[in-house]
Amino acid sequence: MATASADTLCSQQEDESWGNLMLHGFQVEAYKPVRVGDKVCYSFYLKNTGSSDVTLGKKGVYLHTNDGDLSSNSGATISPGKSIFVKDCFIASSSGEWTTYPGVCIITAKGEFCHNFETSCTFDVFIECPENWNCMTAEDASQGNYIRYSDELCGYTITGFTAMNKVRCTATEKLLNALQALGV
């Protein structure tokens, strides 16, 4: 996981099965509060509880994140009674609520099938602003209630206040500015 002192964000309470595969030990760790750019680590076991080999598909075993799926063990075979251990990390690239969940793709005589496990982990990712700055949320940017200082610095006013705050632009705000410039 991240380090010995990382916080546990989520830990699976009960095993979950799909066919002859059992997910157990799902855990997600990071330092709290999780900030944009922080490393989030996860691990879990996938056990073959059946009496014949299970061959993993092209996508193998994966973890779904807000940024897409992280896959491993493509084409691996899990023997009866054996487990594979999955352990990896990703970077929280944007603020907001993140939900992660494991999944698996297997190959059968009828083709490749994928399954998303119901076990999941939901946590918030925050923007860390430099000292004396306020950060613009995606909601602030979508309302267009700001004045642009430059490509990197934005400001916004809140109704009823005349003071402007310096705000670091978010990727969402930059995209909205580009769309506004195109007249969209």
Swiss-Prot record:
This is Uncharacterized protein AF_1942.
